[in-house]
Curated annotation (Swiss-Prot):
InterPro entries given in the database record: F-box-assoc_interact_dom, F-box-like_dom_sf, F-box_dom, SCF_F-box_component
Listed Pfam families: F-box
PANTHER family: BNACNNG10540D PROTEIN, F-BOX PROTEIN CPR30-LIKE
NCBIfam families recorded: F_box_assoc_1
Residue stretches making up the F-box domain: 91-137
SMART domains, alphabetized: FBOX (SM00256)
Lineage, highest ranks first: Eukaryota, Viridiplantae, Streptophyta, Embryophyta, Tracheophyta
Protein name per the record: Putative F-box protein At1g33530
Amino acid sequence: MTFSIEKLVDLKRKKWQSKLQNTKKQVLGRCLTNFSRLLSFRKKQETNGKSPRCSKATLAVVVHPTASTTHDDFLRKKQERSGKSPSCSETTLAVELPDVLVEEILQRLPVKYLVRLKSISKGWKSLIESDHLAEKHLRLLEKKYGLKEIKITVERSTSKSICIKFFSRRSGMNAINSDSDDLLRVPGSCNGLVCVYELDSVYIYLLNPMTGVTRTLTPPRGTKLSVGFGIDVVTGTYKVMVLYGFDRVGTVVFDLDTNKWRQRYKTAGPMPLSCIPTPERNPVFVNGSLFWLLASDFSEILVMDLHTEKFRTLSQPNDMDDVDVSSGYIYMWSLEDRLCVSNVRQGLHSYVWVLVQDELSEKWERTRFNLLGHVFPPLSLNSAWFSQTLVSPYQLSSSTCIGSRQRQNSTSALFSRNGDTGAMDAPIELHISVSTPMMPL
């Protein structure tokens, strides 16, 4: 008898949990529909040349919990102004939602809409720029769609701005390599943040093309041999690592959590003098580590763990002993967070060596691969993969987006997407100012 009662209680609990989930989905669906109507209304006003305006009743669909204006206050003020009772259509949308539902709605919106919604109020701006929402937004994209990467290339626009061009995977390799800038380097892109530096300048820039935010870093003295960018997968801290040469080869790391440069040898010992990365290739960030091809030969690969900040070396695939890295035919890249090495001299139908890692060992596996434009990364040093995400955890130094120039069939302010695949039909250009002038050519 006792077992039957417990079973009945358990069934009732599951039934109510199911009803709660269905109710939550229905509320979210209605709110997202109202959001879509609101954004369509704003877009229509912008198209007609009008300044987009939204009533407080409309925005109350997802009013922030800290807002002081209640629904009753709104009705009272409206009655005082017009002497009329608010219509049913105006009061239908005036619904306050709890914090959880507000975040559930916002994290499902595209990045470009969230950027526009920051201008509604200080409360909205604070919520959208919070690390918590940015992290949830990123994880939801990864879970639902995977990080749909596109190709970007960075070029000098003026002495105080750079131009970021966005390309679809279907654009192929030639579109990326056609206008290569010999002095700009893009050592990496991680979670929607892009690292850029110049060979003839001391500055390093961190950009978020989706929000227009930039951060300028000035590393210690010395000639930059290579710059790497990635995230510590243990702590979630973004780090910029610089190999430099002055009177000897050294390494400095910038931690974006502490906002300080530190000499790496203080914690991990000096870097081997023979481990000089080749300037013809950018480092590759894979699963919390940076990988470099060495300039001396291709017998080893230099590896730095961004958590421990210690260096080690990795042996090359055995089948590639006869290939000279200085020839420029060896390319190292990341695919599905795995390190890949390929010989581009073999053409599009090439063998690719994939590094398979686990807790106890790591080994190379060779596979035949079709290196088409939608899979193979850009070859030029000023290009990289890029994921369109909200992540911009360091808003302390902001800059102004100068503008965007559209090409070909693009129809939106920044992006033109294929409705079926979600892919970009680009190329599209975005000009972002930097807080320090870029050195003229």
